């Protein structure tokens, strides 16, 4: 259940933004938890045709979530597959790349900085002074040079995070997910789940865990982790005879691609602190109701978070960190709309309706 405070921290980190195609609002709150382990990324213009939104829910610490919020979108856009138009492959590679980048001296140093264990100016870490050699650092997002140092054999963090990201490019939406954060789209006020929660009771997940040498006890891998896909959690990825996608816990994302249409109202990406309190349809209904009187999307997100916050910690529900990103699609002006017979039809592979 985690450690709870005597009273919740209700201060919120909220943000709004827009471009010519969409606008977004977000809000994040620590709540009853002793620490804040969520992180997020909201990049309106990843390039001139692309927006990116990601929620990263940390467990066992905050550093992996913060690492992903800083680097995952950079790895998507810098990948050769992205440059050739293969967004799905680029997303998948970026998820796996996070695990690779967090290993070795460079990975250890980055995590130490994000975890506030390193003095960013002196390089002093818990009493040990070390600084990277001149020329070891590189500001290019697609470059990750190896560094020599006392932690060159670091195999990666034992903590981890979920990753649920939505990439909007032209009229296509790509959703990549590992873990139990969730992406939902409202289409004509109906909620459609664009991701699925990765839990040990799913047959495909259970089969992979057992084949990798793990077991499931009380709904947790090896009696410990209640997620089957995550970035980080390297202790569950040490079977040297298996590729990354077949480890007990894998960063391999499910990827869902849909065509956006004029029936789409908005998109939500949120951590399980929200979904544990509201179903997908309940949240969509709540947001529609709020939008009748509120135009600032971050305020709508704040109302969602307040709605989910528990009055006490008796049940544990409503006591988690909470992060929600709300993305609203701008409708074209009547003068800009296409002739009736050329309007895009909803995708035949319409998202599965939420239960």
Swiss-Prot record:
Residues 329-355 are annotated as: Disordered. Residues 23-329 form the PPM-type phosphatase domain. Mn(2+) 1 binds at residues 57-58. It catalyses: O-phospho-L-seryl-[protein] + H2O = L-seryl-[protein] + phosphate; O-phospho-L-threonyl-[protein] + H2O = L-threonyl-[protein] + phosphate. InterPro entries: PP2C (IPR015655), PP2C_BS (IPR000222), PPM-type-like_dom_sf (IPR036457), PPM-type_phosphatase-like_dom (IPR001932). GO terms for cellular component: vacuole. Its cofactor is Mg(2+); Mn(2+). The keyword Coiled coil does not apply. Belongs to the PP2C family. This is Probable protein phosphatase 2C 21. It comes from Arabidopsis thaliana (Mouse-ear cress). The lineage of its organism: Eukaryota, Viridiplantae, Streptophyta, Embryophyta, Tracheophyta. The gene is PPC4-2.
């Amino acid at each position: 259940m985690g450690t709870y405070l005597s009273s919740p921290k209700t201060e919120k980190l909220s943000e709004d933004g827009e471009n010519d195609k969409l606008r977004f609002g977000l809000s994040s709150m620590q709540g009853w938890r002793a620490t804040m382990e969520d992180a997020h990324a909201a990049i309106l213009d990843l390039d001139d045709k692309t927006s990116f939104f990601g929620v990263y829910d940390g467990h066992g610490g905050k550093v992996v979530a913060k690492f992903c919020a800083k680097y995952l979108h950079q790895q998507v856009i810098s990948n050769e597959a992205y440059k050739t138009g293969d967004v799905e492959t680029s997303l998948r590679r970026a998820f796996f790349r996070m695990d690779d980048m967090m290993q070795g001296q460079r990975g250890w140093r980055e995590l130490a900085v994000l975890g506030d264990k390193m003095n960013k100016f002196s390089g002093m870490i818990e009493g040990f002074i070390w600084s990277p050699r001149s020329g070891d650092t590189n500001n290019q997002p697609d470059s990750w040079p190896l560094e020599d140092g006392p932690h060159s054999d670091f195999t990666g963090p034992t903590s981890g995070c979920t990753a649920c990201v939505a990439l909007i490019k032209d009229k296509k939406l790509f959703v990549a997910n590992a873990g139990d954060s969730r992406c939902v789209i409202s289409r004509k006020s109906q909620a459609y789940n664009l991701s699925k929660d990765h839990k040990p009771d799913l047959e495909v997940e259970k089969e992979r865990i057992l084949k990798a040498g793990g077991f499931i006890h009380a709904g947790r891998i090896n009696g410990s982790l209640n997620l089957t896909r995550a970035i980080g959690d390297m202790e569950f990825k040490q079977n040297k005879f298996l590729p990354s996608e077949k480890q007990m816990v894998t960063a391999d994302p499910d990827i869902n691609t849909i065509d956006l249409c004029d029936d789409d109202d908005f998109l939500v990406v949120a951590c399980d602190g929200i979904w544990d309190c509201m179903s997908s349809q309940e949240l969509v209904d709540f947001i529609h109701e709020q939008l009748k009187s509120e135009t600032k999307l971050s305020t709508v997100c704040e109302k969602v978070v307040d709605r989910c916050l528990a009055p006490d910690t008796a049940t544990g529900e409503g006591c988690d960190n909470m992060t929600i990103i709300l993305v609203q699609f701008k409708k074209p002006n009547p003068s800009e709309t296409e002739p009736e017979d050329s309007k895009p039809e909803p995708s035949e592979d319409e998202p599965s309706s939420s239960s």
